[in-house]
Amino acid sequence: MLQPKQTSWVILAGGQARRMGGKDKGFVLFQNKPLIEHALDTLTSQTDQIAINANRSIEEYSRYAVTFSDQFSEYPGPLAGMHSGLVNMNSDWVGFIPCDSPNLPNNLVSLLCNAVKEDTDIVVAHDGEYMQPVVTLMHKRIIPKIDAFLTRGDRKIILLYKECNTVFADFSDYPNAFINLNSPQELEQFGTLL
């Protein structure tokens, strides 16, 4: 069975944050703390190999953890951050969470690890109703597939998941875990819920 300490983790903070008015979401305050700190708090209680994928504010993010940018230009989406994470991290298994989900459970890493089977390429969190495509654990062997996928201009993560041996980890006991704070309205709306 894959153990959490055999994995490394990347916080995805490389997007353009258009719905947040272009503000770097990792540094948007939620409950008096930057969203990047919420993400780090989630992971540091579960694992010790943590990095950040960002395409701006690199110096600021580097104060928190090792930080690297996408290797593909023009913000091709979270898949480019995942590609960079797989290339830059040392472990065979690399996990990913978004920087704007401050309510992820404190057993996220172990639940994803427990879903890994011998031939698994990717584990994706599933909340009982929907897959959560950017809360995932990937094996490095899929790097060539992601390279080809991004090179031909594909961006939809779900299509990549269909090309790989993808399994799902059950998070149905955590109905509010995957709330994303993408806009000022969502920050306000969910501030009291979390």
UniProtKB/Swiss-Prot annotation:
Q: Please list the residues that bind GTP.
A: L12, A13, G14, K25, N53, D70, D100
Q: What's the entry's take on its domains? A: The N-terminal domain determines nucleotide recognition and specific binding, while the C-terminal domain determines the specific binding to the target protein.
Indicate whether rRNA-binding appears among the record's keywords: no
Query: Where does the record locate the signal sequence feature?
Result: none
What name appears for this protein in its UniProt entry? Molybdenum cofactor guanylyltransferase
**UniProt similarity note:** Belongs to the MobA family.
Location comes to: Cytoplasm
Q: Which UniProt keywords apply?
A: Cytoplasm, GTP-binding, Magnesium, Metal-binding, Molybdenum cofactor biosynthesis, Nucleotide-binding, Transferase
**One biological-process term from Gene Ontology?**
bis(molybdopterin guanine dinucleotide)molybdenum biosynthetic process
Required co-factors: Mg(2+)
Known catalysed reaction(s)?
Mo-molybdopterin + GTP + H(+) = Mo-molybdopterin guanine dinucleotide + diphosphate
Q: Which domain of life is it from?
A: Bacteria
Q: Kindly indicate whether the keyword Plastid belongs to this entry.
A: no
The record's function comment reads: Transfers a GMP moiety from GTP to Mo-molybdopterin (Mo-MPT) cofactor (Moco or molybdenum cofactor) to form Mo-molybdopterin guanine dinucleotide (Mo-MGD) cofactor.
Matching Pfam families, A to Z?
A: NTP_transf_3 (PF12804)
> Which principal EC class is assigned to this enzyme?
transferase
One Gene Ontology cellular component term attached to this UniProt record is:
cytoplasm
